[in-house]
Structure formats: structure tokens, C-alpha cells
């Protein structure tokens, strides 16, 4: 289900009514048709099989089966018992799930932001179900080495649209990076922001933050340069610029194995843009990755940039000769070109 600001989320509670004698965390074991596969009713049990021949324990949570972990011990692949639909389930302590999901509850639905479909409350855990995904942007760009401008424009517009919606709704995302965006379809043409768990809810128009939150390669100069406050929205925009550059070039604009050297490069704000990119793409990158926060485009202004309305069939013919020889990141200098991005 979609989460709307004016509509309370529907919470399914199992084992709370007088007609229920068992909580879903205490359900009896369900046996599959094959004797070698057993199902455990306890959330703590799910784990990937050590070998294909060993039994694989899963959990029955309401009308869902929780299968193997996808990330750590709190994110699981889930399957709807009746429809067979595949989802993702995140597990939170019951005492803090509302705080963790507060940004989701205060933001209206958007096509490029992952939506909660259902929440089930147990005695000690909250099970939050999301639509499944088809990989993340980081892995996709790593596989492709870099993207052609037409594809990058289509995907980056969706990314910027999600960020602009969050900013308009009073959220600062703080930890923006390619890995945070996942694909909605197998064709990998539509993306969405994976979660809002790291977002900060603003109390009014002031977007000043003081925490040092984010991935080193995506952090903005002002976060490194000041011990005071900075504009959270402008810092998000800087991270968008790093994402766009990486999508088009195949590596971070600022990269170094040593963190101190990396931060020095970010503070200076100097980077090189390959000549293979079109003038409009270069313009957008430079308009975002400006050292002075007040000079950067806003997330909404990014969406209005003429690069997105480019006739790429004409643009490709003008710059195609250069792109053919520079489409993939070369294998030489692997440490320089790949490690800063693929870590």
C-alpha cells in the first residue's frame, strides 16, 4: 500500500484478538511437500543453506514466508503465500520501528521512492514489507563501466525527481549514493530510492545540519570544511553531482586510496570532465558540483536543465566517434580507475 500523509498506515496485528490464541511468532512449523525442506516459525531461524542439500529454514509471518537474508540479519527475501509475489522484508525492533520509519510516514507517495506495502507487528519485532527490486545503480554502472548519455539522462532524471520530492516534503537524505537507488523493473529502465531510513526530517524551512553523515566519496566540501552547520539540501545536491559524474564517466570525480588525500581533493573542488561528454552534460555537472553551496542548482532546478530535453539521436552522431573509443573504462590503471568507485 502507498503511504500518504493524510492516511494512516494499516497495521496488521496477529495474535492480538480474542479469537487468536497464537501470535505469528509462535506459529507451529509448516512442512513443505519435500521432506528435505522445513520451515521454522521463529524469525531468528532464517538463514541461507550452507549447502544445497541441507534443509533451509524460513519463517511464516502472517501471510508471508521469510526466506534467505539479503542484507545482514535484518533484511529478508519474502514471498506472499497466496499470490507468490516476491517482496523484501525489513525487520526492526518493535520499540524503534516508528522512529526509523518516520520519514516514510511524513512523505507523500512518489513513483521513484520505494513504498511500504504492509507492516506486521509481533511481540518484539516489526516486519516491514517493500516491493522487490532488480538490482541497484552502483552494481549496474559497475557492470556497464559507464552509461551513454541518453540512458544516464533517463535514469538520473528519476533519481533527481525522487530527491526533489523529498526536499519539497521537508526531508534531507544525507547519505545519497548510487547504491541507494534500485531498479523497479527487470529491464532496468525505472529506478526508485531504496529507503528513507537515513533521512532527516526538517522542522520548518531551515535545512541546516551539523552532523557528518554520508559516504566519503559523495561528501560535500562544506561538510569537511566546517565544524558548524551546513545546508543539508545543498549537500544532497552535491551527492547528486557525484552520482551523475560517475554514471557518465565510470569513476568518481574525486578519488584517492588515502582518505586524507581524497578529502583534500574534495575540499578544492577541482575535477576533470572528459571531452567525450556533450556540452549540456558538462554544464549540468559543473552547475551541481560547485564548491560554494549557494551557487549549486537546487534539486528542482536540476529537473529543468536542458540536458534532459536533448535530442540524443543528434547528440550521439556529434559525439559518437569519441564515445566509441572511450565507452568502457580501460583495464589499465585498475587501482586508479576502479577501486575508488567499486569498493
Curated annotation (Swiss-Prot):
* Residue ranges of the region described as Disordered: 25-50
Where in the sequence does UniProt note compositional bias of the Polar residues kind?
A: 29-45
Q: Name one GO cellular component term.
A: nucleus
Which CDD domains did the record assign? PK_TRB2 (cd14022)
Entry-linked InterPro entries: Kinase-like_dom_sf, Prot_kinase_dom, Tribbles/Ser_Thr_kinase_40
Q: What domain of life?
A: Eukaryota
Query: Where is it located?
Result: Cytoplasm; Cytoplasm, Cytoskeleton
**One example GO MF annotation:** ubiquitin protein ligase binding
Domain Protein kinase span(s) in chain numbering: 61-308
User: What is a biological process (GO) this protein takes part in?
Assistant: regulation of MAP kinase activity
Q: Which SUPFAM superfamilies match?
A: Protein kinase-like (PK-like) (SSF56112)
Keywords per UniProt: Cytoplasm, Cytoskeleton, Protein kinase inhibitor
What does the entry state regarding organ or tissue expression?
Answer: Highly expressed in peripheral blood leukocytes.
Gene3D superfamilies for this protein: Phosphorylase Kinase, domain 1, Transferase(Phosphotransferase) domain 1
Print the miscellaneous field: Antibodies against TRIB2 are present in sera from patients with autoimmune uveitis.
Known partners and oligomeric status: Interacts with COP1.
Q: What is known of its domains?
A: The protein kinase domain is predicted to be catalytically inactive.
Q: What does this protein do?
A: Interacts with MAPK kinases and regulates activation of MAP kinases. Does not display kinase activity.
Q: Which family does it belong to?
A: Belongs to the protein kinase superfamily. CAMK Ser/Thr protein kinase family. Tribbles subfamily.
Q: What is this protein called?
A: Tribbles homolog 2
Amino acid at each position: 500500500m502507498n503511504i500518504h500523509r493524510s492516511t494512516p498506515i494499516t497495521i496488521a496485528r496477529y495474535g492480538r484478538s480474542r479469537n487468536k490464541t497464537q501470535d505469528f511468532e509462535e506459529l507451529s512449523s509448516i512442512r513443505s511437500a519435500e521432506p528435505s525442506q522445513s520451515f521454522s516459525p521463529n524469525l531468528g531461524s532464517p538463514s541461507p543453506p550452507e549447502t544445497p542439500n541441507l534443509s533451509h529454514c524460513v519463517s511464516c509471518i502472517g501471510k508471508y514466508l521469510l526466506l534467505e537474508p539479503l542484507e545482514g540479519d535484518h533484511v529478508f527475501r519474502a514471498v506472499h503465500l497466496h499470490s507468490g509475489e516476491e517482496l523484501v522484508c525489513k525487520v526492526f525492533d518493535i520499540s524503534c520501528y516508528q522512529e526509523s520509519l518516520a520519514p516514510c510516514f511524513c512523505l507523500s507517495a512518489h513513483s521513484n521512492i520505494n513504498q511500504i506495502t504492509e507492516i506486521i507487528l509481533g511481540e518484539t519485532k516489526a516486519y516491514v514489507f517493500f516491493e522487490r527490486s532488480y538490482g541497484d545503480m552502483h552494481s549496474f554502472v559497475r557492470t556497464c563501466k559507464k552509461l551513454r548519455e541518453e540512458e544516464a539522462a533517463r535514469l538520473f532524471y528519476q533519481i533527481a525527481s525522487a530527491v526533489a520530492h523529498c526536499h519539497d516534503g521537508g526531508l534531507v537524505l544525507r547519505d545519497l549514493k548510487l547504491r541507494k537507488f534500485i531498479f523497479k523493473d527487470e529491464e532496468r529502465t525505472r529506478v526508485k530510492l531504496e529507503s528513507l531510513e537515513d533521512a532527516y526530517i526538517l522542522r520548518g524551512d531551515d535545512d541546516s545540519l551539523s552532523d557528518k553523515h554520508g559516504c566519503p566519496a559523495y561528501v560535500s566540501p562544506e561538510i569537511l570544511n566546517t565544524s558548524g552547520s551546513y545546508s543539508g539540501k545543498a549537500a544532497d545536491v552535491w551527492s547528486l553531482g557525484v552520482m551523475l559524474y560517475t554514471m557518465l564517466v565510470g569513476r568518481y570525480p574525486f578519488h584517492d586510496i588515502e582518505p586524507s588525500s581524497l578529502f583534500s581533493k574534495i575540499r578544492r573542488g577541482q575535477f576533470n570532465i572528459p571531452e567525450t561528454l556533450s556540452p549540456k552534460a558538462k554544464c549540468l555537472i559543473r552547475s551541481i558540483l560547485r564548491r560554494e553551496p549557494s551557487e549549486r542548482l537546487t534539486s528542482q532546478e536540476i529537473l529543468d536543465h536542458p540536458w534532459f530535453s536533448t535530442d540524443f539521436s543528434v547528440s550521439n552522431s556529434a559525439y559518437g566517434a569519441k564515445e566509441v573509443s572511450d565507452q568502457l573504462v580501460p583495464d589499465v590503471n585498475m587501482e586508479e580507475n576502479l577501486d575508488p568507485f567499486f569498493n
